[in-house]
A protein has these predicted regions:
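Conserved beta-strand scaffold positions in the cores of enzyme catalytic domains, especially
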Residues: 20-22, 90-92, 108
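Residues at the C-termini of beta-strands that transition into short coil/loop
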Residues: 24-26, 94-96, 112
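Short, flexible loop segments at boundaries between secondary-structure elements
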Residues: 84-105
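Non-catalytic surface loops within mature trypsin-like serine protease
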Residues: 97, 113, 178-180
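Surface beta-strand/loop "capping" patches
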Residues: 142-180
């Protein structure tokens, strides 16, 4: 049903079925896939990119608050960390949310009246998806499109509950500020994802408490304890230090505070650049301060 609706919408936009390829990834399940078993999905997407040889790729933003959207965004970052494709331009778009980290830096592309009408017609093709929120989805057609070019130097931004984060070679310091939301407060989790020393994807989670405590760091794939994080805080703010022995220091990390309410996250993922190799960087540049992302 959803696939037929998608094809109908694409026909409205003059895209032929022969130019469409579906990946059959799980609806409302991409965050779980990302955290527990994403390597096969990454391989499939990489093959599609290699086969199609695109000049531009448009993908969801890390800052989109739909958990499926921001999970795909992380997957694309992981793929292009390994994929040598200098001629491919990457662009992100945001459907859900109002993240300043996206809107302050994205470029606006206005639509003509005929283009807006076509977008409305395409949206109406997704009957099962818009059944409960038709007006909201149709309003999306009237707003300008916005795209943010993916660039290495602009990868890291604070967002949502993450007030600041500082990465050193062996640990990660995170400062959190929580909004007062009774629907989110009881379910706070912290996710961290990266590569291990062999280049494999690893993900861990911590259940955030309402007071200071030593917390188990759990491997998302096995649910086994792999370390201890020291948390200091209260229901509205906190900070903790997370050991990074499972993760390669030269690869980027992705972190997210999971405060989901109904379908949507409070915020998406934040990308944290890898620490340069000690063999290639002068000692004076290795301090944790060099990687501090705190707002001053």
């Amino acid at each position: 049903m959803r696939r037929a609706e998608a094809l109908a919408a694409l026909r409205v936009l003059d895209i032929r079925p022969a130019d469409v390829q579906f990946l059959a990834l799980p609806d409302q399940g991409l965050t779980d896939l990302l955290l527990r078993d994403c390597d096969r999905a990454l391989t499939r997407i990489t093959r599609v990119i290699d086969d199609w040889s695109p000049t531009d790729i448009l993908a969801p933003s890390l800052f989109d608050i739909h958990p499926d959207h921001n999970a795909v965004a992380v997957m694309m970052r992981l793929i292009f960390a390994d994929f040598s494709a200098p001629r491919i331009s990457q662009w992100n778009y945001l459907v859900h949310g109002r993240s300043a980290a996206f809107f302050d830096r994205s470029a606006e592309l206005s639509s003509s009246e005929s283009e807006t009408a076509k977008k409305r017609e395409a949206i109406r093709c997704h009957r099962t998806q818009i059944k409960l929120s038709k007006r909201r989805f149709l309003r999306y057609a009237a707003r300008p499109e916005r795209f943010l070019r993916v660039e290495r130097e602009s990868a890291v931004r604070r967002d949502g509950a993450v007030y600041s984060v500082s990465r050193a070679h062996d640990n990660l310091d995170v400062d959190l500020r929580f909004s007062v939301d009774p629907f989110r407060m009881p379910r706070n989790k912290f996710f961290i994802l990266g590569r291990d020393s062999l280049g494999r994807t690893r993900a861990c989670q911590i259940r955030l408490p309402s007071r200071s405590a030593d917390l188990k760091v759990l491997d998302c794939a096995t649910n086994r304890s792999v370390g201890i994080a020291r948390y200091r805080g209260h229901p509205f703010a906190g900070e903790f230090t997370l050991p990074l022995h499972l993760f390669s220091p030269i690869h980027d990390l992705f972190i997210k505070v999971d405060r989901r309410s109904w379908f949507f996250d409070e915020a998406g993922w934040i990308e944290i650049p890898g620490v340069p190799s000690l063999a290639n960087v002068a000692p004076s540049m290795i301090s944790a301060e060099a990687y501090s992302l705190a707002a001053r």
